[in-house]
Amino acid sequence: MILRQVRDSAADAEAVRRIARSAFQDLAARTGDAERSQAPEEEARTVQQLARTRHLARTDPQGCWIAEHDGEAVGAALSMRREGVWILALFVVLPAAQGQGVGRLLLEQAAAHGRGCLRGLLCASPSPAAARRYRRAGFTLHPAMTLAGRVDRAGLLDPGDIPVHPGGPVHRHLLDSVDRSARGAAHGPDHDFMLAHYDELLVADTLAGSGYCYRDGGSVKLLAATSKRIATRLLREALARVPDGTQADVEFLTAEQEWAVDVGLEVGLALGTRGYLAVRGMRPPAPYIPSGGFL
């Protein structure tokens, strides 16, 4: 078996996507999640996954690795450094190659990219094996909640006096500033990716504080704010903009994001649990809803 860096190529991006799909479908089947194990591939999601792999291969080549056995890609890890925070964006091994040390070698290689970083952050699947590996790597695992369902428009409360408006590249300084306040590090070039691939960016900027939220279809992809009041306003606005008939979903909510749970319940979303938000050298960011792909 050999480990090599992920190349910024269509072939490597497709290899990573194939491994991830196989690994996550197998996990869903083993954990009894029939909806995820049988879910068809969505073209838009596939395009985003391929583009994200190539994006990280460009921004963080030392943090993105593929494991190959007899010429076949059997595992992958995508990670990044953002201002002193090491972030593991993806860590997957083909089901047939699991339990053979592939994951350990991949994680060690990716973690070397974060050498010197005092803090670490990742969104973990419900995989018991992955949870053990992250805990051994020094991460604290915070059980995560999910919100899902159709938005009950009658539950959308009066938004109050905090204005929310569409954002864009001109707000990059504000976005990075809010990131640093919430999680201790800016997303930097990842904002360029999200602006290009998600439906919209919502921004709130007042004398009392600032915040932003990315929405893509029914998914709240990332939310950060300097106060719970602004975060609540942004989440309500994002859910109000979910197209009629589209399932809304919000993932990786820790206990610190009770404000988000309250908003979701107000609009009729169902509360569940899935996976973990794992942190090292830091508390879970708050008020904050992490991006599964960029944290």
Model-inferred region functions:
Residues 90-93, 99-112, 136, 228-241:
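Conserved acetyl-CoA-binding loop-helix of GNAT-fold acetyltransferases
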Residues 121-123, 140-154, 271-282:
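Conserved catalytic-core motifs of GNAT/GCN5-like acyltransferases
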Residues 68, 91-98, 219-231, 252-254:
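A short, internal acetyl-CoA/4′-phosphopantetheine-binding micro-motif in the GNAT/acyltransferase core
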Residues 64-66, 72-80, 87-92, 206-221:
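Conserved beta-strand in the GNAT
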Residues 88-89, 113-127, 244-254, 273:
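Conserved GNAT acetyl-CoA-binding A-motif
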